Amino acid sequence: MLRIAVLLTIPLAGLAAGKYDGPRPPKPDIAYLVHADTLIPTETLEAKDDGGLYSVPGASSSARTPLAEPIFLIESDKVLPERLELYRWEVKGGRRELATGKGKRRGSAKPLHLSVNKVDGRLYRIEASEPLENVEYSLSPNDSNQVFCFEVY
């Protein structure tokens, strides 16, 4: 009888341990940088497309992290986390630019490696899978000009 009780308790303990109890994004469809128990909203913008050259205003993002492999949380409503890509941006003329090689312009920007994991319900954890240099970056759905900008410093 004790053996049956133990066998039933082990799976239940595993379910209880899997419950996420960390910080939760206050708004859906915005990527938040994770700094311990603090969530920092990324700078959410719409990138201007000029024939494969994308740009956003400003030389640096208001969202900053010292982490070379940043972690993000996003509560998905409309944004599909599996479609997010990570890009490095160049600063030119007081704005951030990204040349993708689509359209008239040729560029070499390729998405950097990410891991996307479902945490709980519609909550996803997104992690850079490689160390990032101290420059400007964004997460962006691969079918949209929406960008979640941040800076690694």
State where each predicted segment sits.
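Sec-dependent signal peptide recognition
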Residues: 1-7
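Alpha-helix C-terminal capping segments
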Residues: 10, 138-140
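Primarily secretory-pathway and cell-envelope proteins
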Residues: 17-102, 141-153
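A glycine-anchored, Pro-Gly-centered beta-turn/N-cap motif
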Residues: 122, 128-138
